[in-house]
Amino acid sequence: MAKLSDLTNAIVKGSLELAVSTTQEALQENIDPQTLISDYLIKGMEEIGTQFEAGKAYVPNLLMSARAMKGALELL
């Protein structure tokens, strides 16, 4: 079973590999793609955005997170 919190964490950490593998597992388990987007991917981008606003993350972190999200979205 896909651990969907890993998907949010993958986005926050900018881990393309983890984002893709978790998304693949979720799709194999027939989890609704819209749920993945709204409940996990966007949540991860919101978190990294909050960290950026607080000065705890920088532009490279945002770019890595965006790349991880793009990788997950390509599967959907």
Predicted regions: what they are:
Residues 1-75:
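Long amphipathic alpha-helical segments
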